[in-house]
Design a protein with these regions (language model features):
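A cross-kingdom marker for long, charged
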Residues: 181-244
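Signal peptide processing junction and immediate N-terminal pro/mature segment
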Residues: 8-25
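Extracellular-facing segments of soluble proteins and assemblies that are Gly/Ser/Thr-biased and enriched
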Residues: 118-121, 317-379
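Hydrophobic membrane-insertion alpha-helices, especially the h-region
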Residues: 1-8
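Extended amphipathic alpha-helical interaction segments
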Residues: 112-190
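N-terminal Sec/ER secretory leader and immediately downstream segment
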Residues: 21-131, 235-310
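Acidic, serine/threonine-rich low-complexity disordered tracts
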Residues: 231-331, 366-453
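Short helix-loop boundary/capping segments
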Residues: 144-174, 178, 354-411
Length: 453
């Protein structure tokens, strides 16, 4: 929309030769218009008549006033036209934090003012005549204020000055995902862009710093066509696993309880499992997955990446984890297109001590879970069962498999039960069945690939 209006401005004032149809984009530069203010007003009014807008109507007067002001600012259109060449991540559109918040609030106001509101470009084809005829005066003023934030800015984009890690932006995504959706939005099966903007900006107004600054940065990337933090992670989940799920980044109280590097050797660098979930009660929970375990330092700590793909072969869900024995140290889930849970971290160092205890048949153990958990779970309770050869789980596995029957109780009282096996040779736990609110999910292992150190 910004470029359509910019083009119409240049054309209407005679700084472009008149095209048969309005141009798609503004000129690369905005030559100074050597006209008196009265001549500019005259041309602007004539242009209003040409596009079918009464120059004496309230919207006509708003546009004429804006035309007149812009024509006397030779850099204004050049800044707007620079928006044609957006960077891949949208950083060259990112305003300073206070102006980003002002921009988003204006978008919300425009959305609140009209049913089409922020979707005007789609509804009207983005041409100035349609915008002038369909917008309320308040919405039209808001539209020009939006353009002023871009056209009147000076200096480099804020995107050149602000640098956030993917983990920091993903944490903001997770915080936004935790906000309870209001009833007026929840009842919409496919919320409009305007509805989502209203909800997002109302939520952002309540964010403390630095989350508010990071959240507006993330939203501006999306507005400019860049990738969200969730999309960035799903495009290369292995990179995120390597960056964030590193035991050297654990809190000192937890890290200090772990064995030294090299003291707990495992016979692999990477263990990859191709499997399938089968749920006859809830078929949407069924499908193939890949579960990869990585042994980095032979200290008993194993990191895990489980992924699924969509019909196009793109990763659409990723579960990240770090464990030591039966104790989970870190975990996080990311789902397409823009969902993430907070990075959950073990807070109780005593859980490391429990992970060092031998597993004895008939024993019951209770292990603290990383927090904040997904549904208010605090601990996982496991009953230790019989030991059997690991080859009964999958033919190429070595050593023993200890059967486990574990459960977690959610805050609402519902329970998830997981039957699994502990593979002693590999230092990992493999799930066999899951019983939860969606019924029973059976896990079928299709293939196991071991990459040697």
């Amino acid at each position: 929309m910004l470029l359509s209006v910019a083009t119409a401005t240049a054309y209407g004032l005679g700084v472009q030769s008149a095209p048969a149809e309005p141009a798609v984009s503004a000129p690369a530069t905005s030559p100074a218009v050597k006209l008196t203010q009265a001549q500019i007003v005259e041309r602007a009014r004539a242009y209003m008549v040409q596009i079918g807008v009464d120059p004496d109507s309230e919207n006509g007067r708003i546009i004429v006033a804006w035309f007149t002001r812009v024509a006397q600012n030779p850099d204004y259109l050049a800044r707007l036209s620079s928006m044609r060449s957006l960077s891949a991540d949208g950083s060259n559109m990112i305003l300073p934090p206070a102006e980003r918040l002002r921009f988003l609030r204006l978008m919300r106001d425009i959305a609140n003012e009209s049913g089409s509101g922020c979707e005007i470009p789609k509804v009207s084809g983005g041409n100035l005549a349609s915008i002038a005829k369909t917008s309320s005066p308040k919405a039209l003023r808001g539209t020009f204020e939006l353009m002023d934030l871009i056209g009147e800015r000076k200096g480099v984009s804020s995107g050149d000055d602000e640098h956030y890690t993917v983990a920091e932006l993903l944490a903001v995504n997770a915080r936004m995902d935790e906000i309870e959706v209001p009833p007026w939005l929840a009842k919409q099966s496919e919320p409009s862009t305007c509805a989502l903007i209203r909800f997002a900006v109302d939520s952002l107004d309540k964010f403390p710093e630095p989350d508010q600054r990071r959240a507006t940065y993330e939203l501006f990337k999306l507005i400019a066509g860049g990738k969200s933090a969730s999309e960035t992670v799903l495009a290369d989940p292995g990179a995120y696993l390597d960056d964030v799920f590193d035991d050297r980044r654990l809190p000192d109280a937890i890290r200090g309880q772990l064995p030294p590097d090299g003291s707990r050797p495992l016979p692999y660098a990477r263990l990859s499992i191709d499997g399938e979930w089968v749920n006859k009660t809830t078929p949407r929970d069924s499908g193939p997955y890949v579960d990869t375990y990585v042994n980095r330092r032979n200290n008993g700590v194993v990191v895990e990446l489980m992924t699924t793909k969509d019909a196009s072969g793109n990763t659409n869900w990723a579960s990240f984890g770090m464990g030591y024995g039966l104790t989970d140290l870190l975990d996080q889930t990311v789902r397409a297109p823009r969902y993430a849970t907070p990075l959950r971290t073990l807070k109780t160092a005593s859980a490391i001590v429990a992970a060092n205890e031998p597993m004895t048949e008939g024993q019951r153990i209770e292990i603290a879970l990383p927090q904040p958990s997904s549904h208010g779970q605090l601990t996982r309770r496991c009953d230790i069962g019989k030991t059997e050869p690991a080859s009964t789980i999958f033919g190429t596995l070595t050593g023993n498999a200890v059967n486990l029957d574990c459960s977690e109780v959610r805050k609402d009282g519902t329970k998830t039960r997981v039957r699994s096996v502990w593979l002693a040779d590999y230092g990992v736990e493999l799930t066999r069945t899951i019983d939860d609110q969606d019924g029973r999910t059976d896990v079928v292992i299709k293939n196991v690939t071991v990459t040697q150190p």
